[in-house]
Structures are given as C-alpha cells and as structure tokens.
Amino acid sequence: MFMSSSSSSHARRPQLSSFSYLHPPLPFPGLSFFNTRDKRVNFDSTRIICIAKSKPARTTPEYSDVLQTGLPLIVEDDIQEQEEPLEVSLENQIRQGVDIVKSMLGSMEDGETSISAYDTAWVALVENIHHPGSPQFPSSLQWIANNQLPDGSWGDPDVFLAHDRLINTLACVIALKKWNIHPHKCKRGLSFVKENISKLEKENEEHMLIGFEIAFPSLLEMAKKLGIEIPDDSPALQDIYTKRDLKLTRIPKDIMHNVPTTLLYSLEGLPSLDWEKLVKLQCTDGSFLFSPSSTACALMHTKDGNCFSYINNLVHKFNGGVPTVYPVDLFEHIWCVDRLQRLGISRFFHPEIKECLGYVHRYWTKDGICWARNSRVQDIDDTAMGFRLLRLHGYEVSPDVFKQFRKGDEFVCFMGQSNQAITGIYNLYRASQMMFPEETILEEAKKFSVNFLREKRAASELLDKWIITKDLPNEVGFALDVPWYACLPRVETRLYIEQYGGQDDVWIGKTLYRMPYVNNNVYLELAKLDYNNCQSLHRIEWDNIQKWYEGYNLGGFGVNKRSLLRTYFLATSNIFEPERSVERLTWAKTAILVQAIASYFENSREERIEFANEFQKFPNTRGYINGRRLDVKQATKGLIEMVFATLNQFSLDALVVHGEDITHHLYQSWEKWVLTWQEGGDRREGEAELLVQTINLMAGHTHSQEEELYERLFKLTNTVCHQLGHYHHLNKDKQPQQVEDNGGYNNSNPESISKLQIESDMRELVQLVLNSSDGMDSNIKQTFLAVTKSFYYTAFTHPGTVNYHIAKVLFERVV
C-alpha cells in the first residue's frame, strides 16, 4: 500500500515486548520442555483447541528430486524418529498467543506505528505562535535529543537504508541547529551525513523513500540558510537534483491547488505554494493527507488552528515524536486480517475479524479507500485489499471502485504516479480473482496485473517501493503459479509462514516505519505453534488411514499408496482444523472408496450393474451388513462390505459429535452416486456432490435439497468438477502446464474453450458462495467451494508442484 506505519504503543494497549528491535524475547514467555511419547487430544469446552502430542518429532528424508520424479512414497520406514522435546503444555502456549492477539485486535484505534525522526524534526521546527524565537513543541526537540543512534544518525536502528538515515539525520540536525541546542549531537549528525552521502549511489532505486527527490534537496537548501555546509557535488546528489527538477515540471500546480491529490502528502518539499488555496484541501482532522511533516510545514506558513490541533494531538499521543503518517486505521485493520488469514490462525479471531471488517465497511466509499478514514484521496493498494476481504466475507462491494485507477490499458496506484508498486499491483491481482460474472473491470485488472507481475518476475525485479519484506518474490510467484481457484488454505499457510518476515518487515514512506499490529513475531510464533500442532494430528491421521487402507486391501482394488496420500493431502489442505478431524477423514475415505469402486469395475458395465443392485438391496438402517451373507462374487462383496462398514462408522461419528443420526442421508447420497456411475461408468459424474453432501452431513449441516439455491450449487459444482476431472484425465499423460490465469485463452483450441467455460462457471459459483443475503449458512456453501477448488488444483497444478506441496504440508515441520 502507499503509506503504512509501524508503532509506538500506548500505555493502555497490550505491551508487545517481542517488538524490541534489538533483543526480541520469546513471544510466549515460560516455554519449557520435556520428553514424551504420549498421544492425546485435549478439548476445551468453549473453544476447542486440539493438541496432538504425538510420537517424538520425526523427520522425513529430503526429497531433492521431488519435482523431477513421481510423488515420494512416504511410509513409516522412511520416517526417522528423533528424541526431540515437546512443550510442556502446547495448549497453554497457543492459548496465551491467542489471548495476546485478541488483546491487540481489541485495542485497535487509529493505528500503531513507529516514530519518524524526519517528521518529528519538522514539528520541532515550528515556532511558538505566542512566543517567537522559541519552539512550539519543545517535547519534539527532546525526542530528537533522546533518540540519536550510536553512529550519530537518526532512523530505523535495525535497517540501514542510506536514504532513510540521511533524510532523518539531516532533518534532525537542522532542527537542533535552528534552536541552537545540543551542538555536539549536531556535529555528530552532520559528520554522519557527510561520510555517508556517497552511499546513495549504491542504493536500490526501488527502495528510495516516497518523495525523497523532492524532500532531500529542500532540506539541503534549508541547511545552507542555517550555515550548515554539505558538499553537493557528488554524482548521487546531482542525480537527485535532476529527478527533482523533472518531477517539479510534471506537477500540475493548478490542479494540486484545487483538487486533493497525493502531492498534499509532500508539501514541505514543494516551492511557491498558494497556502490560502491549499488550506481548503485539508482533511477533516486538520492534516494534509495525514502527513505530520506536510501539516507542520503548512502550520508554519498559515498558523491554521486545525493544523495546530492535528500536530498538537500527535505530539501528546506519541510523547514528543510523531509518525510519518497518521492515522493508519484502515490500513492496519485490513492488513491485520490478511496476515491472520494467510498465517492460518484467523479461526481463533472470528469476532475480532468481524469487527475489523465492519469498521472498514463503515468507511468504504464508491471510489474506494486509502490508508486512513475520511480521505478524499484513494489508492489502489488499500482499495484492492479492502475489496478482496470485504467480498470474501459476504459484503456487497462494487468493482467500479477500480475504474478511477484505470489509465488506458494500465492500472495505477495513484493518478500521476511516476512508477508502479509491485505490492499494489499484486493486491490488485488478488482482488481481481474475486470476480463475479460480467465484471469487466476486474477482467481487465486481472489481465493487466498478471502480465505486469510476470514481466517483473522474468526480469527478477520483484522489489517493492512500499515495503522491504522477507520474501516478496516467492510470495508473488506462488500467487501467479497457484491462482485463487486452485489455492488450498493449508498450502498457502505453509508457504506464507516462511515468507512472512514478522517484526523484521519494514515499510517505506517518507522514512522507514513499522506496523507492529501487521508485522510482528507474535503472529508468526502463534502460526508456527498452531501449524505444527495441526500437522502432528495430521500425521497421526495419516498413520491411521494407512491402516484402514491396508485393512481393507484397497491396493487390490486399484488404489495405490500414492493416490491415498494425494487424497488425504487434498482433504487436509482444505479442512485442516484439529476439531474438524471427522470431516477431514470423511472426505478422504469417501474419495478413496469412490476411486476403488470406479477403478475395479471400470471396464465392465455388467459388474457395475451388479454392484449397484447389491448396494440397493441393503436395508436403510444402521448395521447394514451385520450377519448378512452376500450372494455375489468376492470382489463385489468386499467392496460393499467396505462401503457400508465405513458408512456405519461415519454415522456413529456424527451421532457422537452432533447427536444426529445421518444414516439415511448418507445412504441416499451414496445411492445417488452409485446409480449415476453405473450408467456411464464415469466416477466424476456426481463425485463432487457426494463429497460435499457427506462433508456437510458430518459437519452437522443438514439442508433441504429441494431448495432452489442448494440445487443450483450442486448443479454448478457437479458441472465444474466433472469438467475439471475430464480435463485432468485427458491431460495427465501430457507435459503439464500451469493454468494461464489471465483470461487470454485461444478460442480456437478446444481445451481453451473448455477452460473458458470452467472459468465462467467458477465465477458464478463464487458469487453464489460469497453472497450473504440468501440466508443459507455460509459454512455449508464454503464446502461447495472447497471441494471445487480441490478439483481445480488437481487439474491445473503440475504433478511435481503437488508433490512438493505434499512434502511441505504434511511432513515438513515449521521451524
């Protein structure tokens, strides 16, 4: 996004001790360890957190050739047990982390953000209105005096960016010099500037601060007026002056004085301004586009009372220092939700997330939003992220908000910008994938953003001008290679945990700044604990499902171990929560039974009919096969016994968990699939419906199948999954290719036409699922989407990539 910030904590807000720049402690104090070989699942009556204390931590072999060869066959003999200590109470550690995050989310106000020495220096330069010759805000000068770094500079102590250190330091030197205080600090700061100014030549241009080419020359001129001599003959400075002159020629002075633009954010660097006109463009809080330095400059020239109130409030709020932008409330609310979701821990915070998005929706406008509420200027980054999250959570938002950002065939983050931001276009791409039917603007946004990001990736130019983050190239690469239709929650989480930098991620504004409620180690450590806990349970389930497989000799019915693993992976990657184990195993076992039946009777219509007849003979009660002798050949008998024994177990599980007898519903669902399959021998016909119906039944969701919406969902899901199944079957022996997620299909190619139809149906399905006004339980509808996305993933994801995901998701612990 455009500007984001990082944080100073208020006294009544949660103390984020882990945000210490120099010595971050463990996020959850009191970790202790011991050896155990115990297996248990603990349940809490109010919030179920299942803690799988499994066998000692086990490691899998490194599958270095996983992308070139077939799926690694991971069996018990491949797994070496290691005596690795486990936390005494993982449940307590997770609960403690959840409580900390809940406290953070519950304390959100205008945004937590770090202090900017540059902006604080501008505030310190303001002369007292009633006592000329003295500072209006002496506490800002004191903040500067207290926060000089050991090398004589000011700026972020953990990240050395020459642009950041130089502009912060020069501004602070000017402020101290103006009021003739702390000459020793001035001298040390000036020495730092002179010794390091040449480093600008080697800096990455993508990481140049916002408006640096305007603000820094302005500071140099101020320094000269105060008698501060700085050599200006370096090639780096000459380049900056050239960029400044070019940018100033492009600034439409007539427009900027009459219409709110992003130039209001950098007024302190612009010459010859008509302040009488500009004051009319103030934000409602008295600021100029929420910039303390820009507003401080305006206060110097206008003595405006609203400017004074804005600055005065910030100085008191942050104890003398001020941020580089404030407030950042919408940015913080949106990005927090995004991080929690991608880290896989959002399920712990449903009420808080609902509150966050409700807040964002209250300030949503027909033109979008920016980083703060009540802004007359919007940006594509915050608008895209907000649009995506609001639509995902059932809010009605129009894609027309993106029209103002379209410029010809391109989309821009702001009108008048000089270069694109990777993350802005990346978030536009993510938003465009929430497309409903006939949303042309999103089609255009998707096509542009995909092409832009692919070109940047091919040129190894995935550096962003708004954030320095741990692994943006792989984050963007994953989104391009695995579009949202194919993106499985656990796969995204497993990879994002490695890409998320926690408190080390730093944002780029006029200075570097941090957003501790967006980027922190509390989220990261909680995500790691929760992921490994879930994975431990998944590993136990994997062991057990292999025993189920062996017990029924499913290998003899055409289901190999690799298929079993892929099927369990698909179920787990969608339904990963410990408390949803029954649904997860039901998904996996149902899919495996379907495969076994379809594979074994693939070439014999007579045997399919025989199987269907025998299936229907069983009474519609519990205990289908108890004591009954099957007068059919052994294979059919074995499969029928297997199916009904498994259905019996499903029914018992549902009865125990939900207190409902779903036996009849299960039988009806299976009978419908069996009869459909026996006609044409195509297992894909109706398979998705069987999975959806069974999963929802096991989750305690019952719904009238006669309802029009329910029938429409089933029809769409069956249609799309059947098409995807056939597409996968037809292309499984060809060289796989990633899905072209840009809408640019070749209409003369039958496969492209099939893809176009799939995309069209997917948009309609997404619209039905995300529409919250139809009265249907969202959890029921989400099952339709989850099953369909698993088919999409299978059809369009390279087998080598699938193998890699399986190894990461199920067998590689997060460290």
Swiss-Prot record:
Subcellular localization(s) per the UniProt record: Plastid, Chloroplast
Keyword Magnesium: yes
Enzyme class: isomerase
Span(s) of short sequence motif DXDD motif: 379-382
Listed GO CC annotations: chloroplast
Record bears the keyword Flavoprotein: no
Main location: plastid
Names of required cofactors: Mg(2+)
One of the Pfam families matching this protein, by short name: Terpene_synth
Residue positions binding Mg(2+): D379, D381
GO terms for MF: isomerase activity; magnesium ion binding; terpene synthase activity
Reaction it catalyzes: (2E,6E,10E)-geranylgeranyl diphosphate = (-)-kolavenyl diphosphate
Keyword field: Chloroplast, Isomerase, Magnesium, Metal-binding, Plastid, Transit peptide
Annotated binding of substrate, by residue: K247, K465
Transit peptide segment: 1-51
Regulation: Inhibited by high concentrations of magnesium.
SUPFAM superfamilies named among the record's database cross-references: Terpenoid cyclases/Protein prenyltransferases, Terpenoid synthases
InterPro entries assigned: Isoprenoid_synthase_dom_sf, Terpene_synth_N, Terpene_synth_N_sf, Terpene_synthase-like, Terpene_synthase_metal-bd, Terpenoid_cyclase/PrenylTrfase
Biological process annotations from GO: gibberellin biosynthetic process
Enzyme Commission code(s) on record: 5.5.1.28
UniProt similarity note: Belongs to the terpene synthase family. Tpsc subfamily.
Role played: Diterpene synthase that catalyzes the formation of (-)-kolavenyl diphosphate from geranylgeranyl diphosphate (GGPP).
Domains as described in the record: The Asp-Xaa-Asp-Asp (DXDD) motif is important for the catalytic activity through binding to Mg(2+).
Protein name as catalogued: (-)-kolavenyl diphosphate synthase TPS14, chloroplastic
Gene: TPS14
